[in-house]
Amino acid sequence: MPTDNDLKTSIVELLHDLDALLVAHFYQKDEIVELAHHTGDSLELAKIASQSDKNLIVFCGVHFMGESVKALAFEKQVIMPKLSCCSMARMIDSHYYDRSVHLLKECGVKEFYPITYINSNAEVKAKVAKDGGVVCTSRNASKIFNHALKQNKKIFFLPDKCLGENLALENGLKSAILGVNSPEEIKNADVVCYNGFCSVHQLFKLEDIEFYRQKYPDILIAVHPECEPSVVSNADFSGSTSQIIEFVEKLSPNQKVAIGTESHLVNRLKAKRHHQNTFILSSTLAFCPTMNETTLKDLFEVLKAYKNHRAYNAVELKDEVAHWAKLALTKMMELS
């Protein structure tokens, strides 16, 4: 049985032999992040991987991320050690999108501007593009939202209700959730949100903020905008994973901070701050199971198979889906 160090050595050699680019999301296991040529959030990795001069992209993340790279750079080979799926992305597909549009019309909404969070599959992104909409990430969501407001239409934000509600609150707008609020409330809302959510960021509660502020009156709270509105509105800072990292790394060593995002990222930030004055904003383990499925063995096996011409877990998209999804993604990049 090979040791972790043996696997790491073999992975580095295979990446070199295959002339491959290895990218990993911040929420991946530490040993995967350690080997990656680049780490980042969804937007950063999509840009880096699609613009790389490497023809083989090895993506350690969840499936929609690999799809985004494939859509942006259709000619590249994109493989994933695990075809893990984001739970939020699984909450909507092209059928549910069509059904949601039908429900909007039943509520009297004749025109709308769709924004899909990047945590959605390529088919949903393609549908949004066909309806004139765009993709956003947590990093550029405010810019994309401001662009959408200029279209003078009701905004349909999917699939994350929390991010949609937080953007509405940020702009002083009225929001409603499709399937939760009444048809009248849907019709009168400025922003209609699909009823999806992140299972990890739902774990952070206002009570957690109150607990830490009572214990440490000078503590700062930094959270991801996928958290509930009550959490985001009471935090000192809200931003994407990259923005949270930037925020925390600028703090003085003596400044206490509680962070509301996935535990692997928080633990890395703790380590950088010598495990002092850094806390995770939850009494439960804020762990993303699908983001952490990929192991060193998985990475080694997928690379070895590719070298032996037995490739598997390749990300494949239909031509039309890739075309329309790329339009939505490139539009996002142009606007951000």
Swiss-Prot record:
According to UniProt, the name of this protein is Quinolinate synthase
Which purpose does this protein serve, as stated in its record? Answer: Catalyzes the condensation of iminoaspartate with dihydroxyacetone phosphate to form quinolinate.
- Note the Pfam families from the entry: NadA
Q: How is the cofactor bound?
A: Binds 1 [4Fe-4S] cluster per subunit.
Q: Which organism is it from?
A: Helicobacter pylori (strain HPAG1)
For biological process, the GO terms are: 'de novo' NAD biosynthetic process from L-aspartate
What is stated as this protein's family in its record?
A: Belongs to the quinolinate synthase family. Type 3 subfamily.
Q: Binding positions for iminosuccinate?
A: 25, 42, 117-119, 138, 224-226, 241
- Keywords associated with the record: 4Fe-4S, Cytoplasm, Iron, Iron-sulfur, Metal-binding, Pyridine nucleotide biosynthesis, Transferase
User: Which reactions does this protein catalyse?
Assistant: iminosuccinate + dihydroxyacetone phosphate = quinolinate + phosphate + 2 H2O + H(+)
